[in-house]
């Protein structure tokens, strides 16, 4: 039924599809269909952060049990957004810095860092990838972090502890998390050398 679509779609885009309940829900759908619909919906939402009318249209259409492919103009927005993401990814390829287990890079784009970080994870071949952007009005770094299956630590817990130590805030899931820390603390965040360090598995 349609009511069982949104939960597994959300689980896929939030990296929770391996959890017991989510895994059971995901298994009820053709995986390719679910991935296409979930990703397209995520891109529609991400590309429309400053378009409240279209965001409300998404809500209205979903409330009428329409699938993302039925949202008029939605797939076109998702396609344009995908092109924008890929353009940013190509622009930073040569700037990625690599440590023992961690790859990281700064972006200067209107795109949220969370839209780019998985590309860095794949391109670097490292267990953990980090993408950040600076926000001058609050003198902070906005950080997104992802881990591959090779990552053997709980990133959300590490980032929560580390960012709190550095007068920031953060946390999240085992393989996907984020943080906001003072800009002057970023180097310390990267190089922290103890059991909470991202680059010392």
Predicted regions and their residues:
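A structured phosphate/pyrophosphate-recognition subdomain
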Residues: 1-100, 106-107, 111, 120-124, ...
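Glycine-rich, acidic loop segments that terminate in or are immediately followed by a histidine
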Residues: 101-201
């Amino acid at each position: 039924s349609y009511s069982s679509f949104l939960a597994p779609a959300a689980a896929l885009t939030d990296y929770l599809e391996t959890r017991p309940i989510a895994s059971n829900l995901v298994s009820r759908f053709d995986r390719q269909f679910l991935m296409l619909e979930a990703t397209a919906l995520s891109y529609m939402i991400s590309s429309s952060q400053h378009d409240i009318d279209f965001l409300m249209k998404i809500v209205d259409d979903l409330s009428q049990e329409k699938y993302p492919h039925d949202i008029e103009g939605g797939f076109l927005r998702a396609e344009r957004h995908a092109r924008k993401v890929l353009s940013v990814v190509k622009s930073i390829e040569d700037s990625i810095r690599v440590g023992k287990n961690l790859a990281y890079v700064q972006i200067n784009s209107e795109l949220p860092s969370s839209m780019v970080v998985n590309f860095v994870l794949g391109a670097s071949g490292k267990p953990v990838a980090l993408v950040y952007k600076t926000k001058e009005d609050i003198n902070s770094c906005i950080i997104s972090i992802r881990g591959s299956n090779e990552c053997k630590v709980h990133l959300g817990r590490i980032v929560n502890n580390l960012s709190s130590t550095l007068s920031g805030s953060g946390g999240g899931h085992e393989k996907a998390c984020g943080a906001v820390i003072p800009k002057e603390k970023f180097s310390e965040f990267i190089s922290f050398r103890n059991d909470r360090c991202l680059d010392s598995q």
